[in-house]
A protein has these predicted regions:
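Conserved N-terminal beta1-alpha1 strand-loop-helix module at the mouth
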Residues: 14-58, 69-73
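Short, Lys/Arg-enriched N-terminal segments with co-localized hydrophobic residues
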Residues: 1-8
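Active-site mouth loops of central-metabolism enzymes
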Residues: 23-42, 94-103, 133-140, 167-181
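Conserved, mostly hydrophobic/aromatic
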Residues: 28, 48, 108, 121, ...
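Catalytic cores of alpha/beta
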Residues: 100-114
Length: 202
Protein backbone atom coordinates (compact mmCIF):
# COMPACT_ATOMS: atom_id res chain seq x y z
CA UNK A 1 0.00 0.00 0.00
CA UNK A 2 1.44 3.36 -1.04
CA UNK A 3 0.11 6.48 0.64
CA UNK A 4 0.58 9.87 -0.93
CA UNK A 5 1.36 12.90 1.17
CA UNK A 6 -1.65 14.01 3.16
CA UNK A 7 -3.49 10.69 2.84
CA UNK A 8 -4.47 8.67 5.88
CA UNK A 9 -4.81 4.93 6.10
CA UNK A 10 -8.32 3.81 7.00
CA UNK A 11 -8.44 2.14 10.39
CA UNK A 12 -9.61 -1.45 10.31
CA UNK A 13 -11.91 -2.18 13.20
CA UNK A 14 -11.29 -5.83 13.89
CA UNK A 15 -13.74 -7.64 16.19
CA UNK A 16 -12.54 -8.33 19.71
CA UNK A 17 -13.62 -11.93 19.43
CA UNK A 18 -14.76 -14.39 16.78
CA UNK A 19 -16.94 -17.49 16.88
CA UNK A 20 -15.45 -20.53 15.19
CA UNK A 21 -17.70 -22.75 13.11
CA UNK A 22 -17.18 -26.03 11.29
CA UNK A 23 -18.95 -27.50 8.26
CA UNK A 24 -17.15 -30.84 7.91
CA UNK A 25 -20.12 -33.03 8.81
CA UNK A 26 -22.12 -31.51 5.94
CA UNK A 27 -19.76 -30.06 3.34
CA UNK A 28 -16.91 -32.44 4.07
CA UNK A 29 -19.04 -35.50 3.39
CA UNK A 30 -21.35 -34.11 0.70
CA UNK A 31 -19.46 -35.42 -2.32
CA UNK A 32 -18.30 -38.72 -0.87
CA UNK A 33 -19.46 -41.54 -3.12
CA UNK A 34 -20.03 -43.95 -0.25
CA UNK A 35 -22.60 -43.24 2.43
CA UNK A 36 -20.97 -42.14 5.68
CA UNK A 37 -22.70 -44.04 8.51
CA UNK A 38 -24.86 -41.94 10.81
CA UNK A 39 -22.81 -43.18 13.77
CA UNK A 40 -19.67 -41.69 12.21
CA UNK A 41 -21.34 -38.36 11.49
CA UNK A 42 -22.69 -38.20 15.02
CA UNK A 43 -19.30 -39.02 16.52
CA UNK A 44 -17.62 -36.27 14.52
CA UNK A 45 -20.31 -33.71 15.39
CA UNK A 46 -19.98 -34.59 19.08
CA UNK A 47 -16.19 -34.32 18.99
CA UNK A 48 -16.33 -30.94 17.24
CA UNK A 49 -18.70 -29.64 19.90
CA UNK A 50 -16.49 -31.02 22.68
CA UNK A 51 -13.52 -29.32 21.01
CA UNK A 52 -15.31 -26.00 21.47
CA UNK A 53 -16.96 -25.17 18.16
CA UNK A 54 -20.04 -22.99 18.69
CA UNK A 55 -21.43 -23.20 15.17
CA UNK A 56 -21.86 -26.48 13.34
CA UNK A 57 -23.28 -27.28 9.92
CA UNK A 58 -24.46 -30.86 10.24
CA UNK A 59 -26.73 -31.88 7.36
CA UNK A 60 -28.83 -31.04 4.32
CA UNK A 61 -32.61 -31.45 4.47
CA UNK A 62 -32.90 -31.50 0.68
CA UNK A 63 -34.26 -34.34 -1.45
CA UNK A 64 -32.42 -37.53 -0.38
CA UNK A 65 -32.77 -38.90 -3.91
CA UNK A 66 -30.60 -36.02 -5.11
CA UNK A 67 -28.35 -35.90 -2.03
CA UNK A 68 -28.24 -39.52 -0.76
CA UNK A 69 -25.44 -38.68 1.67
CA UNK A 70 -28.04 -36.85 3.74
CA UNK A 71 -30.84 -39.40 3.71
CA UNK A 72 -30.24 -39.58 7.46
CA UNK A 73 -30.86 -35.85 8.07
CA UNK A 74 -33.73 -36.47 10.47
CA UNK A 75 -32.06 -39.37 12.26
CA UNK A 76 -28.75 -37.55 12.71
CA UNK A 77 -30.51 -34.46 14.04
CA UNK A 78 -32.59 -36.52 16.47
CA UNK A 79 -29.57 -38.40 17.76
CA UNK A 80 -27.48 -35.25 18.14
CA UNK A 81 -30.18 -33.60 20.24
CA UNK A 82 -30.51 -36.75 22.36
CA UNK A 83 -26.74 -37.18 22.74
CA UNK A 84 -25.57 -37.97 26.28
CA UNK A 85 -22.13 -36.60 25.37
CA UNK A 86 -23.14 -33.16 24.12
CA UNK A 87 -26.89 -32.75 24.54
CA UNK A 88 -26.36 -30.51 27.55
CA UNK A 89 -24.02 -28.28 25.51
CA UNK A 90 -26.38 -27.66 22.59
CA UNK A 91 -27.96 -24.62 24.23
CA UNK A 92 -24.67 -22.81 23.51
CA UNK A 93 -24.14 -24.27 20.02
CA UNK A 94 -25.84 -23.09 16.82
CA UNK A 95 -26.75 -26.03 14.58
CA UNK A 96 -27.21 -25.26 10.88
CA UNK A 97 -28.82 -27.27 8.09
CA UNK A 98 -28.87 -26.58 4.35
CA UNK A 99 -32.33 -25.94 2.89
CA UNK A 100 -32.04 -25.03 -0.78
CA UNK A 101 -35.70 -25.55 -1.72
CA UNK A 102 -39.18 -25.29 -0.21
CA UNK A 103 -39.62 -28.89 0.93
CA UNK A 104 -36.31 -28.76 2.79
CA UNK A 105 -37.49 -25.75 4.79
CA UNK A 106 -40.79 -27.47 5.51
CA UNK A 107 -38.89 -30.51 6.81
CA UNK A 108 -36.85 -28.37 9.19
CA UNK A 109 -40.00 -26.66 10.45
CA UNK A 110 -41.51 -30.09 11.13
CA UNK A 111 -38.30 -31.11 12.89
CA UNK A 112 -38.42 -28.00 15.08
CA UNK A 113 -41.95 -28.90 16.14
CA UNK A 114 -40.67 -32.36 17.11
CA UNK A 115 -37.81 -30.86 19.13
CA UNK A 116 -34.78 -31.73 17.00
CA UNK A 117 -34.74 -29.13 14.22
CA UNK A 118 -31.78 -26.84 13.48
CA UNK A 119 -31.27 -23.41 14.99
CA UNK A 120 -30.36 -21.94 11.62
CA UNK A 121 -31.04 -22.78 7.99
CA UNK A 122 -29.12 -21.76 4.92
CA UNK A 123 -30.40 -20.57 1.55
CA UNK A 124 -28.00 -20.06 -1.35
CA UNK A 125 -27.88 -17.87 -4.45
CA UNK A 126 -25.09 -17.71 -7.03
CA UNK A 127 -23.90 -14.60 -8.83
CA UNK A 128 -23.93 -16.83 -11.91
CA UNK A 129 -27.37 -17.65 -13.31
CA UNK A 130 -26.12 -20.94 -14.80
CA UNK A 131 -24.56 -22.11 -11.55
CA UNK A 132 -27.62 -21.07 -9.58
CA UNK A 133 -30.05 -22.92 -11.85
CA UNK A 134 -27.87 -26.05 -11.72
CA UNK A 135 -27.75 -25.86 -7.93
CA UNK A 136 -31.38 -25.04 -7.20
CA UNK A 137 -33.42 -25.84 -10.31
CA UNK A 138 -34.84 -22.30 -10.30
CA UNK A 139 -34.00 -19.02 -11.95
CA UNK A 140 -32.59 -16.34 -9.67
CA UNK A 141 -35.83 -14.34 -9.90
CA UNK A 142 -37.95 -17.31 -8.87
CA UNK A 143 -35.54 -18.24 -6.09
CA UNK A 144 -35.63 -14.76 -4.56
CA UNK A 145 -39.44 -14.95 -4.56
CA UNK A 146 -39.31 -18.32 -2.83
CA UNK A 147 -36.97 -16.98 -0.15
CA UNK A 148 -39.18 -13.96 0.48
CA UNK A 149 -41.99 -16.42 1.25
CA UNK A 150 -40.01 -18.88 3.35
CA UNK A 151 -37.77 -16.63 5.46
CA UNK A 152 -40.75 -15.46 7.56
CA UNK A 153 -41.90 -19.08 7.95
CA UNK A 154 -38.46 -20.07 9.22
CA UNK A 155 -38.45 -17.15 11.65
CA UNK A 156 -41.91 -18.11 12.89
CA UNK A 157 -40.54 -21.58 13.64
CA UNK A 158 -37.72 -20.06 15.71
CA UNK A 159 -34.91 -20.52 13.20
CA UNK A 160 -32.36 -18.01 12.01
CA UNK A 161 -31.77 -17.70 8.27
CA UNK A 162 -28.39 -17.41 6.57
CA UNK A 163 -28.29 -16.02 3.05
CA UNK A 164 -25.29 -17.35 1.14
CA UNK A 165 -23.84 -15.73 -1.97
CA UNK A 166 -21.87 -18.22 -4.07
CA UNK A 167 -19.45 -17.86 -7.00
CA UNK A 168 -18.31 -14.43 -5.79
CA UNK A 169 -14.92 -14.77 -7.52
CA UNK A 170 -15.83 -16.95 -10.47
CA UNK A 171 -18.09 -19.67 -11.82
CA UNK A 172 -17.04 -23.15 -13.04
CA UNK A 173 -19.65 -22.81 -15.80
CA UNK A 174 -19.52 -19.15 -16.87
CA UNK A 175 -16.02 -18.17 -15.77
CA UNK A 176 -15.25 -14.83 -14.06
CA UNK A 177 -18.14 -13.13 -12.27
CA UNK A 178 -18.79 -9.52 -11.29
CA UNK A 179 -18.09 -8.72 -7.65
CA UNK A 180 -20.72 -5.99 -7.72
CA UNK A 181 -23.34 -8.74 -8.01
CA UNK A 182 -22.12 -10.25 -4.75
CA UNK A 183 -22.51 -6.86 -3.08
CA UNK A 184 -25.97 -6.41 -4.60
CA UNK A 185 -27.09 -9.89 -3.50
CA UNK A 186 -25.73 -9.34 0.01
CA UNK A 187 -27.86 -6.22 0.36
CA UNK A 188 -30.85 -8.04 -1.03
CA UNK A 189 -30.53 -10.83 1.52
CA UNK A 190 -30.52 -8.30 4.33
CA UNK A 191 -33.47 -6.45 2.81
CA UNK A 192 -35.64 -9.59 2.77
CA UNK A 193 -34.82 -10.61 6.32
CA UNK A 194 -31.71 -12.82 6.38
CA UNK A 195 -30.05 -12.81 9.80
CA UNK A 196 -26.51 -13.22 8.50
CA UNK A 197 -24.60 -13.62 5.25
CA UNK A 198 -21.98 -16.08 4.04
CA UNK A 199 -19.86 -15.58 0.94
CA UNK A 200 -18.55 -18.57 -0.99
CA UNK A 201 -16.18 -18.94 -3.93
CA UNK A 202 -17.80 -22.14 -5.23
Amino acid sequence: LILRKGEKMALLHYPKKVVLGDITVRDGFQHEEKFIPTDAKLWLAEELILAGFKRLEVTNFGNPKVMPQFKDADMLSKRLHASKKVGHLLKDVEITAITIRERAVERTIEARKEGYGPDRILFMVSTSESHHRTNSGLSLDDYWKMCETYIPKAHDAGMKVCGTVSTIWGCPIEGPTELKKAVEFTRRWLDIGADDIEHADH
